[in-house]
Structure formats: C-alpha cells, structure tokens
C-alpha cells in the first residue's frame, strides 16, 4: 500500500521533467524569460526548488529544453501538413499561419530575453540556418509546381525576410503597430512578390479567408 501511495505522490523523473518543461515553456512565452524565476516555476508545479534543480541544473538548461520541445512540435506539425497538402504553397501558408498564431501568443520580451542566454541563442541561430535551407528547398519545389517565380534568388530573399523578422524582434516598431500587424505585413508582402499569377490567386484566397476568421474570432 505504501509503495502504491509513494508512486502516486512521486511521479517518475521523466513525467516530472515533462511537467516542468510544459509549465516553464508556457510561463516564458506568456511573461518573458527574465521575469520568471526558478522559484516561480517550482511554486506553479507545487514542488520544492531543490527538486526542480535536481532535474534541471539551471534556468538556461531548462530554457534550452523548452525550446527543443517547441522545435520538436514544430517539426511534427511540418511533417503532418506536408503529408496532407496538395501543393507546396499550401504547406507554406499553413506554416506561416501557425507562425502568426505563435507570435501573437508570445510576449515580445521572450525574444529580447533569449539573447541573454548564449548557449540557447547559439542553438537558435544554428536552427535558423537549417530552417532557411529547408525553406529554400520548399520554394524550389514551388517553382516546379508553378506557384513561385523562377527569376527570384530565394537565398537572398529568404535572408532579407529573416533579417526583417530579427529587426522586428529587436526594435520599438511594435509600440506603434501591433506585433501581429507588422509580422503579417512582412510575410504577405514577401509572398506576393515571389508568387506567379497562379500562386497569387491561391495566396489572396488564403489571406481573405484568414482575415475573415481573425475578424470573427475578435468579435
């Protein structure tokens, strides 16, 4: 009986690790990283700070695991969308829609704070470079399918958009306009510029439907 009670009171280390990552990731995204302490996370989970430090040695290690979790979820989503989509533009539009939703629900301080953690920031840069290569491969497939122009240097365009997004995360632009509004303007202008007539028609259908859904959800 005691053994059973102990198992209920003390979940496995793996289960505890998952709970910690879930709670920490949600807290970091909602409030920013700097404002959330290890004490806050322990309190939210109802565990001691000592127990938390037994699982994660420090805040940066925990943050890195949180980002790995988010990246794994993103990879799974890409795979699912790719398997169901009928063309590459549909894949990209769904991915951008997910990005918009993620940015909308993320505190801007999260992006500002991440630079204070060198190991985590370095991991993000490496991941960003890998994602860029995959994005360019998508665009090349889109050319073959007739959705994107074949006279565009996608390596340059992708770099420019990436730098625009980096700038967005590190300026006061969002004090005048909402983060979501600026992000949408960048992405939709970008996609319009690289699309063929066929791609542009598909894109405008998506934008119209997306904005109708967003308006309906805000009413």
Predicted feature locations:
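Hydrophobic alpha-helical connector segments
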Residues: 65, 76-105, 158-161
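All-alpha amphipathic helical-bundle segments outside canonical DNA-binding/catalytic cores
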Residues: 90, 127, 144-160, 174-184
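Helix-loop "lid/cap" segments that line or gate small-molecule binding pockets
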Residues: 81, 97-101, 110-113, 188-194
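Short secondary-structure transition hinges
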Residues: 101-156
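Basic, helix-initiating cap at the start of DNA-binding domains
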Residues: 1-31, 35-47, 61-64
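Short hydrophobic/aromatic patch on the recognition helix
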Residues: 46-56
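C-terminal peripheral helix-coil segments that are non-catalytic and often amphipathic
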Residues: 1-5, 137, 141, 145, ...
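Hydrophobic/aromatic residues within well-ordered alpha-helical segments
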Residues: 16, 59, 66, 70, ...
């Amino acid at each position: 009986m005691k053994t059973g009670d102990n198992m209920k009171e003390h979940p496995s280390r793996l289960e505890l690790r998952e709970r910690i990552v879930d709670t920490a990731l949600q807290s970091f995204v909602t409030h920013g990283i700097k404002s959330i302490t290890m004490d806050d996370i322990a309190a939210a989970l109802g565990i001691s700070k000592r127990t938390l430090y037994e699982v994660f040695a420090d805040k940066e290690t925990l943050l890195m695991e949180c980002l790995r979790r988010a990246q794994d979820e993103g990879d799974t989503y890409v795979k699912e969308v790719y398997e169901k989509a009928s063309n590459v533009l549909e894949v990209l539009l769904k991915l951008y829609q997910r990005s918009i939703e993620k940015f909308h629900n993320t505190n801007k301080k999260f992006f500002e704070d991440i630079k204070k953690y060198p190991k985590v920031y370095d991991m993000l840069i490496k991941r960003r470079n890998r994602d860029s290569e995959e994005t360019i491969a998508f665009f090349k497939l889109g050319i073959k399918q007739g959705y994107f122009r074949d006279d565009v240097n996608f390596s340059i365009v992708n770099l420019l958009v990436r730098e625009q997004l980096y700038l967005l995360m590190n300026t006061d632009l969002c004090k005048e306009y909402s983060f979501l509004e600026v992000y949408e303007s960048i992405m939709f202008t970008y996609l319009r510029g690289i699309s063929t007539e066929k791609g542009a028609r598909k894109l405008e259908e998506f934008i119209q439907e997306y904005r109708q859904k967003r308006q309906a959800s805000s009413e």
